[in-house]
């Protein structure tokens, strides 16, 4: 489930900002509605996607960052596992790391996860 399109980082090796443009965040309400619909249809795992997924900031709720979004998804009945792809180490907050310990539905760090840290960024 895409929550962010584009990127604002402009890493020297990366074409994403030039090909996909600046970051555009989906509204929190739209994401949560899509998660609820997926859970109601029997989907038990939600994977959040974005060029830098953990840089999420809801355009429709100034208090909703990536941690708050994951917490809201965690509270949706039917969701058993939450995964995310392409986080950037710079955007991991202490609050999110604490949420990873506290919320059992958040999948742990996986070797398949694509991260700039793995690409020597």
Name each model feature, range by range.
Residues 1-29:
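Canonical Radical SAM [4Fe-4S] cluster-binding loop centered on the CxxxCxxC motif
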Residues 18-47:
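Conserved alpha-helical substructure of the radical SAM core
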Residues 40-121:
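Conserved SAM/AdoMet-binding glycine-rich loop
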């Amino acid at each position: 489930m895409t929550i962010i399109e584009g990127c604002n980082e402009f890493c020297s090796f990366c074409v994403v900002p030039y090909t996909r443009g600046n970051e555009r965040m989906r509204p929190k309400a739209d994401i949560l509605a899509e998660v609820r619909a997926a859970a109601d249809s029997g989907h038990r795992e939600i994977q959040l996607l974005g060029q830098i997924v953990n840089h999420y900031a809801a355009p429709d709720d100034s208090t909703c960052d990536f941690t708050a979004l994951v917490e809201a998804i965690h509270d949706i009945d039917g969701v058993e596992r939450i995964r995310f792809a392409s986080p950037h180490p710079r955007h991991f907050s202490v609050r999110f790391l604490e949420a990873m310990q506290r919320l059992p539905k958040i999948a742990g760090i996986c070797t398949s996860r694509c991260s700039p840290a793995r690409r020597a960024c």
